[in-house]
Design a protein with these regions (language model features):
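Positively charged n-region of N-terminal signal peptides that target proteins for export
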Residues: 1-4
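Short amphipathic alpha-helical "recognition" segments used for binding
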Residues: 6-7, 101
Protein backbone atom coordinates (compact mmCIF):
# COMPACT_ATOMS: atom_id res chain seq x y z
CA UNK A 1 0.00 0.00 0.00
CA UNK A 2 2.85 2.38 0.85
CA UNK A 3 4.46 1.68 -2.53
CA UNK A 4 1.26 2.52 -4.39
CA UNK A 5 0.99 5.78 -2.46
CA UNK A 6 4.64 6.69 -3.12
CA UNK A 7 4.34 5.89 -6.84
CA UNK A 8 1.13 7.93 -7.02
CA UNK A 9 2.85 10.93 -5.44
CA UNK A 10 5.82 10.58 -7.81
CA UNK A 11 3.48 10.34 -10.82
CA UNK A 12 1.63 13.49 -9.74
CA UNK A 13 4.89 15.42 -9.24
CA UNK A 14 6.20 14.34 -12.65
CA UNK A 15 2.97 15.31 -14.38
CA UNK A 16 2.97 18.71 -12.65
CA UNK A 17 6.56 19.30 -13.77
CA UNK A 18 5.41 18.74 -17.33
CA UNK A 19 2.62 21.30 -16.95
CA UNK A 20 4.97 23.85 -15.39
CA UNK A 21 7.63 23.37 -18.07
CA UNK A 22 4.98 23.66 -20.81
CA UNK A 23 3.79 26.95 -19.31
CA UNK A 24 7.34 28.27 -19.32
CA UNK A 25 7.97 27.20 -22.89
CA UNK A 26 4.78 28.94 -24.04
CA UNK A 27 6.12 32.36 -23.04
CA UNK A 28 6.65 34.58 -26.03
CA UNK A 29 10.25 35.39 -26.85
CA UNK A 30 11.32 39.02 -26.56
CA UNK A 31 10.32 40.97 -29.64
CA UNK A 32 12.87 43.33 -31.18
CA UNK A 33 11.73 46.34 -33.19
CA UNK A 34 14.13 48.56 -35.13
CA UNK A 35 12.89 52.14 -34.80
CA UNK A 36 15.44 53.93 -36.99
CA UNK A 37 18.59 53.31 -38.98
CA UNK A 38 21.67 55.28 -39.92
CA UNK A 39 22.21 56.18 -43.60
CA UNK A 40 24.31 53.05 -44.15
CA UNK A 41 21.51 50.84 -42.83
CA UNK A 42 22.97 50.06 -39.40
CA UNK A 43 20.59 50.30 -36.47
CA UNK A 44 20.29 53.71 -34.79
CA UNK A 45 17.55 52.82 -32.28
CA UNK A 46 15.88 49.57 -31.32
CA UNK A 47 13.34 48.48 -28.76
CA UNK A 48 13.19 45.09 -27.09
CA UNK A 49 9.75 44.24 -25.75
CA UNK A 50 9.92 42.09 -22.63
CA UNK A 51 7.08 40.31 -20.86
CA UNK A 52 4.41 42.69 -19.62
CA UNK A 53 4.81 46.39 -20.13
CA UNK A 54 8.62 46.73 -19.97
CA UNK A 55 10.54 47.93 -23.03
CA UNK A 56 14.32 48.14 -23.30
CA UNK A 57 15.51 51.03 -25.47
CA UNK A 58 18.98 50.97 -27.03
CA UNK A 59 20.43 53.71 -29.23
CA UNK A 60 23.65 53.29 -31.19
CA UNK A 61 26.35 55.52 -32.63
CA UNK A 62 27.19 55.27 -36.34
CA UNK A 63 29.99 52.83 -35.43
CA UNK A 64 27.32 50.52 -33.87
CA UNK A 65 28.63 51.03 -30.34
CA UNK A 66 25.91 51.65 -27.77
CA UNK A 67 25.05 55.31 -27.13
CA UNK A 68 22.29 54.88 -24.51
CA UNK A 69 20.60 51.89 -22.92
CA UNK A 70 17.77 51.60 -20.42
CA UNK A 71 14.26 50.36 -19.73
CA UNK A 72 10.91 52.05 -19.62
CA UNK A 73 7.59 50.93 -18.24
CA UNK A 74 4.69 51.67 -20.56
CA UNK A 75 1.78 53.27 -18.71
CA UNK A 76 -0.97 54.03 -21.20
CA UNK A 77 0.57 56.37 -23.77
CA UNK A 78 3.46 57.35 -21.51
CA UNK A 79 6.82 55.69 -20.97
CA UNK A 80 8.57 56.14 -17.64
CA UNK A 81 12.19 55.27 -17.02
CA UNK A 82 12.89 52.42 -14.62
CA UNK A 83 16.04 50.71 -13.43
CA UNK A 84 19.53 51.50 -14.66
CA UNK A 85 20.10 53.88 -17.58
CA UNK A 86 23.56 54.10 -19.11
CA UNK A 87 25.18 56.41 -21.65
CA UNK A 88 28.48 55.83 -23.39
CA UNK A 89 31.15 57.74 -25.27
CA UNK A 90 31.55 57.00 -28.97
CA UNK A 91 34.53 54.73 -28.19
CA UNK A 92 32.33 52.54 -25.95
CA UNK A 93 33.54 53.69 -22.52
CA UNK A 94 30.96 54.65 -19.90
CA UNK A 95 29.85 58.28 -19.82
CA UNK A 96 27.03 58.09 -17.24
CA UNK A 97 24.88 55.72 -15.24
CA UNK A 98 21.80 56.54 -13.19
CA UNK A 99 18.97 54.72 -11.47
CA UNK A 100 15.28 55.46 -11.99
CA UNK A 101 12.08 54.53 -10.24
CA UNK A 102 8.80 55.41 -11.95
CA UNK A 103 10.49 58.03 -14.14
CA UNK A 104 12.31 59.78 -11.31
CA UNK A 105 16.03 59.65 -10.45
CA UNK A 106 16.26 57.38 -7.43
CA UNK A 107 19.55 55.75 -6.47
CA UNK A 108 23.13 55.98 -7.61
CA UNK A 109 24.33 58.52 -10.17
CA UNK A 110 27.77 58.49 -11.74
CA UNK A 111 29.57 60.07 -14.68
CA UNK A 112 33.03 59.36 -16.04
CA UNK A 113 35.66 61.35 -17.88
CA UNK A 114 36.55 60.15 -21.41
CA UNK A 115 39.68 58.50 -19.96
CA UNK A 116 37.51 56.27 -17.73
CA UNK A 117 38.20 58.03 -14.43
CA UNK A 118 35.19 59.08 -12.34
CA UNK A 119 33.80 62.58 -12.86
CA UNK A 120 30.78 62.80 -10.52
CA UNK A 121 29.45 60.32 -7.95
CA UNK A 122 26.24 60.98 -6.06
CA UNK A 123 22.81 59.74 -5.09
CA UNK A 124 19.20 60.72 -5.64
CA UNK A 125 16.19 59.97 -3.51
CA UNK A 126 12.88 60.45 -5.27
CA UNK A 127 14.40 63.00 -7.68
CA UNK A 128 16.31 64.99 -5.05
CA UNK A 129 20.09 64.97 -4.53
CA UNK A 130 20.95 63.31 -1.25
CA UNK A 131 23.99 62.09 0.64
CA UNK A 132 27.61 62.65 -0.28
CA UNK A 133 28.41 64.03 -3.75
CA UNK A 134 31.97 63.95 -5.09
CA UNK A 135 33.50 65.64 -8.13
CA UNK A 136 36.79 64.49 -9.62
CA UNK A 137 39.34 65.91 -12.04
CA UNK A 138 40.53 63.86 -15.01
CA UNK A 139 43.24 62.20 -12.90
CA UNK A 140 40.68 60.86 -10.40
CA UNK A 141 41.48 63.35 -7.63
CA UNK A 142 38.51 64.70 -5.65
CA UNK A 143 38.25 68.44 -6.34
CA UNK A 144 34.92 69.13 -4.65
CA UNK A 145 32.53 67.32 -2.35
CA UNK A 146 29.47 68.18 -0.37
CA UNK A 147 26.78 66.47 1.66
CA UNK A 148 23.15 67.18 0.87
CA UNK A 149 21.56 64.81 3.36
CA UNK A 150 18.35 66.43 4.59
CA UNK A 151 18.06 67.25 8.26
Amino acid sequence: MKRVFIFSVIAIVISLCGVISNEKSEKKPNRVEVISNWGDGTVKEERIYHDGDVVEIITYFENFKINTKGRVKVEGKEEVRIGTWSSFYKNGTHWSQSEYSNGVSDGGYQTWHPNGNPNIIGFYSNGVETGQWKFFDTTGTVVKQYNVTPG
